[in-house]
Amino acid sequence: MRSPFAPLALAAALIAAAPAHAKPADPAVAKKILIDSVAIPTVEGRGKVPELAAYYAGVLKAAGFTDADIVITPIGETASFAATLKGTSAEKPILLLGHMDVVEADAKDWTRDPFVPVEEKGYIFGRGSEDNKFDVAMMVATMAQLKKDGFKPRRSIILLLSGDEETAMVTTRALAAQYKDAEFALNGDGGGGLIGEDGKAKYYGLQAGEKTYADFTLEVTNPGGHSSRPSAINAIVQLSTALAKIGAYHFAPQQNELTRVGMPIVADQVGGDIGAALKAFAANPADTAAIAAITADPEYVGQIGTTCVPTLVKGGHAENALPQRATANINCRIFPGVEIEAVRAELEKVIADPAVAVKTDPDATASDASPLRPDVMAAVTKAVHARFPGLPIIPSMSAGATDSLHFRAVGVPSYGVAGLFSKASDSFAHGLNERAPVAAIPGALAHWDSLLRDLSK
């Protein structure tokens, strides 16, 4: 198979030869946008997402965007946001993705009020300061700066912000359906760089795939009866047997372009026995020793195939009665490209008991990984290496879902290319005292400016 990086050197050379351009957005402006964004509590149920969308519209209109360039679409108590920087051609547009909503935060558990942004000791504290308002602020600031500069992209650039990515993704689905004819999408809610605790950059991760999140319900029903008269058929026992089979089962190892390209780079980073196993698996996905080593490591087991684990069990209705019903939830993270129904059928085969019904959660959506486009890889390489020369860039597949899931599902290649570089010890997304380093803002702005100018021309 031809390497996805075969045309990369040429593409990178062409990009590097591009003429100098105006400076990225002002870090002070971007910081204000971030702080103002965090101050609006866009948690599900508070109805504040439209307010944040209106704020972003105001920022962009002040830079020269017109009313016709911006569309805010209310959906229930939330909304979606779209802003278009028109291109000079009729070629397919480039999408920028992010989300305006945040997860809930209980003020009594935080050191500071999560919705009163505070700049302290080099950080901006507050819910959403990292996920996802940091890169959203950088994208909004960059779009505004491009407009001010009079930049004329060949391809239109459309900034799309969802309003319920953290929950139902209704706005995400609507945006994906509306903009399914795009060339590709760049998502600020995926990827990004890791800074070591010594302050040195370690690597940059480019997210090009997501495992499908799917829940399956196992259900056994019996007539029941008095516990003093036990029968050979017991719903809890039958369910327990099925769960034991699932717990002992391993889905067949799989490989895709992301693991073939990314695993050897990860292997060089981690070293040791697991590094050797990752490198061996990338070279030969049938290597049983490598499979055994990776399967035994919780950090990497999800990178080589589908995983399914029991997460909830319910059964019985009284202490002195035979159970009439027993259920369990099986949470699966499905390898990109594998159909949800195929996993359900495989679970049924593993259980091998027709008394155990296997039902699929209807909300699950499957999507394949995105191809590693040479133009995207070259642009990301240029942007990252401008900040950290020679830094490893690792194509990756995440276990959690972002808006990219629904865009990939409708055929839009999507790449997580966040501009944020941070230490692992600074990452508190969804957690207490979430924060973002102020020092990361200038580099993130340069990152987005470079990507958008290079990929849209």
Residue ranges and their predicted role:
Residues 7-16:
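Bacterial N-terminal signal peptides
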Residues 18-22:
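Sec/Tat signal peptide C-region and signal peptidase I cleavage site
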Residues 23-107, 325, 329, 340-341:
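N-terminal helical capping/dimerization or prosegment-like subdomains
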Residues 31-42, 219-222, 354-366:
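Acidic/histidine-rich, surface-exposed loop or edge segments in extracytoplasmic proteins
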Residues 39-47, 124-130, 204, 224-230, ...:
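Second-shell loop/turn segments in exported
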Residues 89-91, 194-196, 201, 254-317, ...:
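An extended, acidic, His-containing surface patch that forms the Zn2+-binding/catalytic region
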Residues 91-161:
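Active-site metal-coordination/substrate-binding segment of hydrolases
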Residues 154-235:
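Histidine/acidic-residue-rich, glycine-tolerant segments that coordinate divalent metal ions
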